């Protein structure tokens, strides 16, 4: 059996060039990744190293704030799911401890009377900015500049995905027009020695939306499951690269042929870890259903049609409810002792 390999590193710059042969080779490599485990890394994109550096600085400045300041903008359904995600308030992997991380949810600043907010579309609303930062305006500007750059990169990646399916680049325009996305700043304290399974940085899970673009620091810790062998493969950091992984929406639309793989974070470095995932959800009203090119004769359709909002909201709700139940049970145990 061939030894499983970590996600390959692909030069995405050819997508923007005029070499049709090189572009076709990129499309073929991405297709192979989608059929394997849905993970690959890209270099040669248009997001500048300077913007990446400034955005990491924003994340670190936020997490350096006192807890009391961060909790002033704590995330809740009543706050449009924007703001601070407290340590261990999210359980990605059923049956495990909650995730050993804290985060900040950001997105486009939408007024409360925007149709998406009125209709309570997932994570749509005004941002909750940390007022305790000395350089708050700079923090806002950098965060939103980065959001815009990643939104465009996500649309470019989706265009390549359309090509991998032998559609035109514009095939998924109805999915990307009016799309929503979530930018998250994440901070992982060092993983306790000998506690790699009981409390993962992020438990094993599949992402819920269309695609994720992840910028990680040099600490590492991200692992993707090779399902045929059951091995966890380290996704080693590449300076400036984005880890791309397909999520459940594309897996549903391809009837499971394109993979949304299990992945997790185990911070075994003994150091703090920072990462910046960008979750491209897509147009919340887009109906994801099995594409005709993936309906093989005699093969049942695995999932009924559902809107992007329905697919993502159900999955996200489960992760929060699991963490709440776990923490409530733990508090009950401690109170009884």
Curated annotation (Swiss-Prot):
Fe cation binds at residues 205, 207, 263. Residues 179-282 form the Fe2OG dioxygenase domain. PROSITE patterns: FE2OG_OXY. Transmembrane segments: none annotated. 2-oxoglutarate binds at residue 273. One of its GO terms (molecular function) is 2-oxoglutarate-dependent dioxygenase activity. Binds 1 Fe(2+) ion per subunit. The keyword Iron applies. Disruption phenotype: Results in increased endocrocin production. Induction: Expression is positively regulated by the transcription factors brlA and laeA. Endocrocin is specifically produced in conidia. Pathway: Secondary metabolite biosynthesis. Belongs to the iron/ascorbate-dependent oxidoreductase family. PANTHER family: 2-OXOGLUTARATE (2OG) AND FE(II)-DEPENDENT OXYGENASE SUPERFAMILY PROTEIN-RELATED. This is 2-oxoglutarate-Fe(II) type oxidoreductase. It comes from Aspergillus fumigatus (strain ATCC MYA-4609 / CBS 101355 / FGSC A1100 / Af293).
């Amino acid at each position: 059996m061939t030894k499983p390999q970590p996600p390959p590193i692909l030069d995405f710059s050819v997508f923007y060039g005029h070499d049709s042969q090189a572009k076709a080779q990129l499309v073929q490599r991405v297709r192979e990744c989608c059929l394997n485990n849905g993970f690959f890394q890209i270099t040669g994109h248009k997001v500048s190293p300077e913007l990446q550096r400034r955005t990491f600085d924003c994340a670190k400045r936020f997490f350096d704030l006192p807890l009391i300041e961060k909790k002033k903008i704590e995330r809740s359904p009543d706050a449009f799911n924007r703001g601070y995600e407290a340590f261990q308030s999210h359980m990605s992997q059923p049956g495990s401890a909650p995730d050993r991380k804290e985060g900040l949810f950001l997105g486009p600043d939408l007024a409360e009377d925007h149709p998406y907010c009125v209709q309570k579309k997932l994570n749509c609303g005004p941002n909750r900015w940390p007022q305790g930062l000395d350089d708050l305006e700079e923090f806002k500007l950098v965060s939103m500049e980065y959001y815009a750059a990643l939104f465009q990169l996500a649309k470019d990646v989706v265009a390549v995905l359309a090509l991998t399916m032998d559609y035109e680049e514009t095939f998924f325009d109805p999915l990307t027009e009016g799309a929503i996305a979530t930018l998250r700043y994440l901070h992982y304290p060092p993983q306790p020695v000998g506690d790699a399974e009981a409390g993962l940085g992020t438990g094993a899970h599949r992402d819920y939306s269309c695609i994720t673009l992840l910028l990680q620091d040099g600490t590492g810790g991200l692992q993707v499951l090779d399902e045929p062998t059951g091995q966890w493969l380290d996704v080693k950091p590449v300076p400036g690269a984005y880890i791309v992984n397909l999520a459940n929406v594309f897996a549903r639309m391809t009837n499971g042929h394109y993979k949304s793989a299990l992945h997790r974070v185990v911070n075994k470095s003994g150091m703090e870890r920072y990462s910046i995932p960008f979750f491209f959800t897509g147009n919340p009203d887009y109906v994801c259903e099995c594409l005709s090119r993936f309906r093989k004769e005699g093969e049942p359709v695995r999932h009924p049609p559902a809107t992007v909002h329905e697919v993502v909201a159900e999955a996200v709700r489960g992760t929060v409810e699991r963490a709440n139940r776990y923490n409530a049970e733990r508090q009950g145990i401690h109170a009884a002792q």
